Curated annotation (Swiss-Prot):
Residues modified as 2,3-didehydrotyrosine: Y105
Cross-link type 2-iminomethyl-5-imidazolinone (Gln-Gly), residue numbers: Q104-G106
Gene Ontology biological process terms, A to Z: bioluminescence; generation of precursor metabolites and energy
Tissue specificity as recorded in UniProt: Tentacle and oral disk.
Keywords: Chromophore, Luminescence, Photoprotein
Family classification: Belongs to the GFP family.
Physiological role: Pigment protein that is green in color.
Pfam family, one: GFP
Name of this chain's protein: GFP-like fluorescent chromoprotein cFP484
């Protein structure tokens, strides 16, 4: 009887020891899983290097046009370049700058996000997302933009509709007096289950001074994704080169997401 008791006790101790080892291994595995960088969970869908194909159909103050383009981007570095060409409606009788943000700020999946901010945009693929933007200029000019962004293999596909109206004939847009968009910051926050972005933006003018414009964008993922907390996206958009009439243009953007740089005391 004593031998049987010792045997049973030994077996019980061994079972408890093995169970503890198993639980520790499971905990270690769970901890390692939680530490996997966010980028690795989306990299199977979105590659480190992505191609871009786009088409914009638009109308500004009654002038219709079509622009097509291709490019390349690094979604996890926050940079991309586009080569664009006016296919219909050339030469454009207005400043090209008002179009550029619909191409570059148009795909936030090409923004560099840190691991501690949920990347609403990359999560949305392969289904993709759409967005709508209103641009209100200081001289009462208005732009409405809609874009649908999808994915085919290693390429982002943009279908863009751009409508501008009420630009004064003697204003900086119709007189082509703008030089570039200044660097800016988009405020990102959740409202009614979608992501909203606000920007107070400025165009540098020939001879000095600035031309103000307020952006409001609504981003809608095509599937349920994790929503981010209130954050910011810093971005700079530049025209690298262009021909005389801006029929062919190369654009570049750098964009990085972040929380506030100021520490909280609350």
């Amino acid at each position: 009887m004593k031998c049987k008791f010792v045997f049973c006790l030994s077996f019980l101790v061994l079972a408890i020891t093995n169970a503890n080892i198993f639980l520790r291994n499971e905990a270690d595995l769970e901890e390692k899983t939680l530490r996997i960088p966010k980028a690795l969970t989306t990299m199977g869908v979105i590659k480190p290097d992505m191609k871009i194909k786009l088409k914009m159909e638009g109308n500004v103050n009654g002038h219709a046009f079509v622009i097509e383009g291709e490019g390349e981007g690094k979604p996890y570095d926050g940079t991309h370049t586009l080569n664009l060409e006016v296919k219909e409606g050339a030469p454009l009788p207005f400043s090209y700058d008002i179009l550029s943000n619909a191409f570059q700020y148009g795909n936030r999946a090409l923004t560099k996000y840190p691991d501690d901010i949920a990347d609403y945009f990359k999560q949305s693929f392969p289904e993709g997302y759409s967005w709508e933007r209103t641009m209100t200029f200081e001289d009462k000019g208005i732009v409405k933009v809609k874009s649908d962004i999808s994915m085919e293999e290693d390429s982002f596909i943009y279908e863009i509709r751009f409508d501008g109206m009420n630009f004064p004939p003697n204003g900086p847009v119709m007189q082509k007096k703008t030089l570039k968009w200044e660097p800016s910051t988009e405020i990102m926050y959740v409202r009614d289950g979608v992501l909203v972005g606000d920007i107070s933006h400025s165009l540098l003018l020939e001879g000095g001074g600035h031309y103000r414009c307020d952006f409001k964008s609504i981003y809608k993922a095509k599937k349920v994704v994790k929503l981010p907390d209130y954050h910011f996206v810093d971005h700079r958009i530049e025209i690298l080169n262009h021909d005389k009439d801006y029929n062919k243009v190369t654009l570049y953007e750098n964009a990085v997401a972040r929380y506030s740089l100021l520490p909280s005391q609350a």
